[in-house]
């Protein structure tokens, strides 16, 4: 059970939990954190953010049935997700250069993921979990930390990252996320 505070600022501002993303936002840009989580200013998402969700979904489909998904199916899913109000993309996102660029790269991200997840020395079984919620309660902190692990295997977890460049070293954001998971 979490510690109950008098004049709990989290309760006052409707913050029921932290996530790895929220913690990273606070560390990297406290003003953005205040805008998003205190003042509830919801900025628009974009094609790059939706790309990650799209690749995650199609890789999960691949892992479930070991059948490749066509490039047209991937692009169709991406387009429908960018258009979906849940992802909160700007209404003009489908006309943007960023959207066209991401659309053209989707199949490459998917193929890299399939190659990695199909390597004989790494992957032999279906994941035992997908988008599994974790909750960390600390008696000294008034709200829990909550996150979702993309893929769970018997002896590994995978948090999918899609990026145009392979970083030479892991970022502090990723280290914080790894510490939570």
Kindly give the residue locations of the regions a language model identified:
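Short amphipathic alpha-helical segments and their helix-coil junctions
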Residues: 9-15, 30-42, 157, 161-163
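Nuclease catalytic cores
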Residues: 20-68
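Short, flexible loop/turn motifs enriched in small residues
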Residues: 19, 28, 144-148
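Accessory terminal regions of nucleic-acid processing enzymes
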Residues: 1, 60, 142-146
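Terminal, charged accessory segments of proteins
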Residues: 1-27
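Mg2+/Mn2+-dependent nuclease catalytic core
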Residues: 125-127, 132-181
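A non-catalytic, helix-rich entry segment at domain boundaries
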Residues: 58-137
């Amino acid at each position: 059970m979490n510690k109950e505070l008098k004049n709990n600022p989290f309760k006052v501002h409707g913050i029921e939990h932290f996530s790895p993303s929220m913690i990273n936002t606070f560390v990297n840009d406290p003003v953005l954190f205040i805008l998003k989580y205190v003042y509830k200013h919801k900025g628009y998402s974009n094609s790059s953010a939706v790309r990650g969700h799209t690749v995650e979904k199609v890789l999960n489909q691949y892992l479930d049935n070991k059948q490749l998904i066509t490039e047209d199916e991937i692009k169709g899913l991406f387009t429908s997700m960018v258009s979906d109000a849940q992802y909160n993309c700007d209404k003009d996102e489908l006309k943007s250069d960023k959207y066209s660029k991401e659309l053209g790269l989707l199949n490459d991200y998917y193929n890299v993921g399939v190659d990695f997840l199909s390597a004989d020395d790494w992957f032999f079984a279906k994941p035992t979990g997908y988008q599994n919620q974790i909750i960390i309660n600390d008696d000294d902190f008034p709200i829990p930390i909550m996150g979702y692990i993309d893929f769970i295997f018997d002896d590994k977890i995978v948090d999918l990252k899609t990026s145009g460049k392979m970083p030479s070293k892991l970022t502090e954001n990723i280290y914080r996320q790894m510490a939570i998971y």
